[in-house]
Amino acid sequence: MDQGSQTIKGKDRYKSGVMEYRKMGYWEPDYEPKETDVIACFRITPQDGVDPIEAAAAVAGESSTATWTVVWTDRLTAAEKYRAKAYRVDQVPNTDDQYFAYIAYDLDLFENGSIANLTASIIGNVFGFKPLKGLRLEDMRLPTAYVKTFQGPATGIVVERERLDKFGRPLLGATVKPKLGLSGRNYGRVVYEALKGGLDFTKDDENINSQPFMDWRERFLYCMEAVNKAQAATGEIKGTYLNVTAATMEDMYERAEFARDLGSNIIMIDLVIGWTAMQSMAKWARRNNMILHLHRAGHSTYTRQKTHGVSFRVIAKWARLAGVDHIHAGTVVGKLEGDPATTKGYYDICRDEFTHRKLENGIFFDQPWASLNKMMPVASGGIHAGQMHQLLDLLGDDTVLQFGGGTIGHPMGIAAGATANRVALECMVLARNEGRDIVNEGPEILQEAARSCTPLQQALETWKDVTFNYTSTDSPDYAVTATASV
């Protein structure tokens, strides 16, 4: 969409009263973004009768320096520099009322190393702006100069693998089920059986903190006893994600320190704690040589719908800057939202040294990562051993595959469920390394392995008909049609 700048110049720019945003300098179609600019792509849905150019200029204004009327104090600032600039508006393919608005922000508008400050502008009051039916932050380009003000993941994929001494395959985990109600002793039994059976990790779920049925100290003690026994029994390094999420930072630090003192190598936090708490825990994890796992609890309240909110690809970028080592990023084949092409984009953001623009995966900008450590994506939610060929093909080696119900729901017990998943993974990795077509031969490869592994045979029989084939609500706009889950 092309429309010339209508910015009012000179003294008329500062006349008292209300002025269109585009005339105030927030629409600059000839602007060439600088390498140091923060660039955002918004999906805007204007109210009926609202011009999309004016809507884009309004988003630029309300997310940077503007208010609803002209203020004389603009003349006391370098307004030309600090005003965000909407410089391009494109109609969203296959829509009549949605537009992609590209907006550039001067780097000086943001505090170094602060996700809280960045988000206060980019997704602040502007998301309640009445002239818009909907507003969604689709993607951001964060310049190298800004990226380098963040610590990034404290451990990273390479060092995590070195600590675990596990290479050449995805890591295996399981969320303890039921997520609520177990006593500390029984919780620890689940952890031990799963780790002894072949998993690398177990984890707390997002809402297990410190409830009447199980105090957090009790859980930590029983879990670490289970980890130590499983390590002794198997000769492998094991771990369990101890959720330190709590009401205050003081409580979270206390729990994290207790986990460290018990010998844990990993702690967990929930996305709902907020960005300041997340960055604080990431700095603590770096100081204490701990892996930090982020459960994305709550994200779908604002990432799932296409017309309003924030895309998860943006959340993944912010999380990598903030410094978490793991993040739940979707499974494609599981029970939770996950378009294949879109999920591929999420995984690229986590693991790339430089993420290239790829519209078919929902990536709108090239993104340099300035040597920040890579972040391990986690696949969790409704997956089982019978999908192992799909998971390995779609998600690759550098991921954690978490089979909660797919381990603990095994008809032969928890240890058997873990063994089934470990055998399924190792037979699939071996077949891939031998050059076999695991996508098409996957079921056959699993059946071959199951002939000498009863737990795997039982898993394949139990969940053979379980699929979650629903069309995704968040597929790339530059694909021809929405892609159904595999």
From Swiss-Prot:
Binds 1 Mg(2+) ion per subunit. The keyword Transit peptide does not apply. The record marks K335 as: Transition state stabilizer. InterPro entries: RuBisCO, RuBisCo_large_chain_AS, RuBisCO_lsu_C, RuBisCO_lsu_C_sf, RuBisCO_lsu_fd_N, RuBisCO_lsu_N_sf, RuBisCO_lsuI. It catalyses: 2 (2R)-3-phosphoglycerate + 2 H(+) = D-ribulose 1,5-bisphosphate + CO2 + H2O; D-ribulose 1,5-bisphosphate + O2 = 2-phosphoglycolate + (2R)-3-phosphoglycerate + 2 H(+). Its cofactor is Mg(2+). Keywords: Calvin cycle, Carbon dioxide fixation, Lyase, Magnesium, Metal-binding, Monooxygenase, Oxidoreductase. One of its GO terms (biological process) is reductive pentose-phosphate cycle. Mg(2+) binds at K203, D205, E206. Its EC number is 4.1.1.39. CDD domains: RuBisCO_large_I. It holds the Pfam family RuBisCO_large_N. PROSITE patterns: RUBISCO_LARGE (PS00157). Substrate binds at N125, T175, K179, R296, H328, S380. The modification N6-carboxylysine is found at K203. GO terms for molecular function: magnesium ion binding; monooxygenase activity; ribulose-bisphosphate carboxylase activity. The active site is at K177 (proton acceptor), H295 (proton acceptor). The basic functional RuBisCO is composed of a large chain homodimer in a 'head-to-tail' conformation. In form I RuBisCO this homodimer is arranged in a barrel-like tetramer with the small subunits forming a tetrameric 'cap' on each end of the 'barrel'. Belongs to the RuBisCO large chain family. Type I subfamily. RuBisCO catalyzes two reactions: the carboxylation of D-ribulose 1,5-bisphosphate, the primary event in carbon dioxide fixation, as well as the oxidative fragmentation of the pentose substrate. Both reactions occur simultaneously and in competition at the same active site. Heterohexadecamer of 8 large chains and 8 small chains. This is Ribulose bisphosphate carboxylase large chain.
